[in-house]
Amino acid sequence: MKFPSLLSLGVAASTTIVAAVPDQKPIGDIIEDVHLGKFLIELGPGDTRWVTEEEKWGLRRDGRRFFDITAEAGQGVFPKTFAQTTVTFPTELQNVAHVKKLASSLSKNRLQTFLTKFTSFYTRYYKSESGRQSAIWLFEQIEKTIQESSATEARVEKFEHPWGQFSIIATIPGQTNKTVVVGAHQDSINLLMPSILPAPGADDDGSGTATILEALRVLLKSEAVTQGKAPNTVEFHWYSAEEAGLLGSQAVFAQYKQDNRDVKSMLQQDMTGYSKGTTNAGHADSVGIITDFVDEGLTNFIKKVVTGYCGISYVLTKCGYACSDHASASRYGYPSAFVIESKFEYSSKLIHSTRDEVSSLDFDHMLQHAKMTLGLVYELAFADL
């Protein structure tokens, strides 16, 4: 039996959503399933099943996305459901001149230099040693970016997980604890043999990782931001283990909900670098704004941001249930949105393989995502949310 989803299609920010809890297994049976190496996944609202790890990867190879909610099952009640936070987003851009001046400092060369190194790790698979080493290197780059700015109160922290690769959170404090979040996932995967084969992950999601880091670097050039004059706090997140069922982002937002964090928005940047699918199909270059399982108010404001700050337009597209880390934010009641490189059917088909390399990317296109990210973060940092 299926029940209404926590992430109802096209939900408005003002809508309160309640999802029913499916039939529960006895806790002893759950412990036994975990002991046998099984994982509880949620493929859609109310659609849960226990699977082996190989079955998880088989579903991913078939294009299915899901939450891995095994940790919730271990607590005896799943899935957890939360009412959506109500947020009124701006109706117009308020900082165009300042944002455009900042955006002129965004660098394609920096994006390419970063990705050349980031994709040189054998794999960024979340349980691998090279996946942990890539996270350490990424943390150092973020730390250096903050140190080279005048933001004395900004900080970067590791969010540890039971597996090897940690998530990373960079924070720029504002005048309140109201928080604007931008995220990407740092892990990669080769779905043929995840723990053995290389996975450069240039587009998925090295591109998003680089995009938001470059946006952070340029945002820190704003004295108003670095001096803590923005009304709202800004965070940049790099999640671990997205490919395994949004594990890292679920852990982060579960902790935020437990701590009563006041997250006003979350934008995910996952796959920001591939444009050939669009242009080879005879269409003008554009970014893809996801419209399913997202916050309607935030998504509508992002349309204005793209129009105001990017040199290309947008198309509306869908990606399905639990298709990236923004879904974890929504799962815990926080307004979220997702912008991808193109209409979903034109996105890169090279991902999850050895062929997802830097040579396939369009850095001019990535720069447009960086402009959008910078514009959104700056506008919302200074908005009355």
From Swiss-Prot:
One of its GO terms (cellular component) is extracellular region. Its cofactor is Zn(2+). Its EC number is 3.4.11.-. Residues 21-87 form a propeptide. CDD domains: M28_AAP. It is an enzyme of class 3 (hydrolase). It comes from the Eukaryota. Residues 1-20 form the signal peptide. GO terms for molecular function: aminopeptidase activity; metal ion binding; metalloexopeptidase activity. It is found in: Secreted. Glycans are attached at residue 177. Zn(2+) 2 binds at residues 204, 243, 352. Keywords: Aminopeptidase, Disulfide bond, Glycoprotein, Hydrolase, Metal-binding, Protease, Secreted, Signal, Zinc, Zymogen. Extracellular aminopeptidase that allows assimilation of proteinaceous substrates. This is Leucine aminopeptidase 1. The lineage of its organism: Eukaryota, Fungi, Dikarya, Ascomycota, Pezizomycotina.
